[in-house]
Amino acid sequence: PPMTPAMPHGLNLSGEEAASKRARLAEGLKARGARAAIITLADSVCWLHNIRGSDLPHTPFVLGFAILYSDASSELFLDDAKHSPELIAHLVDGVRLRAPEEFVAALDALAGHAVLADPASAAHAVFDRLSKQKARILRAPDPCQLPKACKNAVEIEGMRQAHIRDGAALTRFLAWFAGAAAQGGLTEIDAAQKLEGFRRATGCLS
């Protein structure tokens, strides 16, 4: 599996501290009577903890799992190879780093509790394990997805700047394409590679 270091996603980019996000979502868990929520989607894990990585091409995610608790604490399950010094310094009180091998034991510790899990994203093994431990499973959407979609002012500005950079790269590509296509012999792969090259030149494409 990919083993790139996890890095902080700064407040200047996220617009909200990770602790604030956890606290907001924890209130929702308490309102539902849930002890915890199982977070398995990479984008949710990264958004909730304000971290990023390079485990996937062109997508700044680090692959792992998390459990968010109703007291606003969380457990983040990442391989040791992903524990960069920057990550350690970034994660403050309330977040416990654990090995992926400990995920099953963490599920077992929720025996008898109400636990939220998303059937659209969590693996069957998660539901099977919780069921065996007599947990009360609340099947509901990943609690990160809706808040993550509601962008704050900092995120909106970041999106605007990203579109400006990408728009400039696309404009350069179209200018090149107008000449290259007229000469003939151009393939879709040629065009795709050239466009990626213009986008890489922005310095913002992993």
Question: What is each of the regions a protein language model found here?
Answer:
Residues 1-206:
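Active-site neighborhoods and metal-handling regions in enzymes and metal-associated proteins
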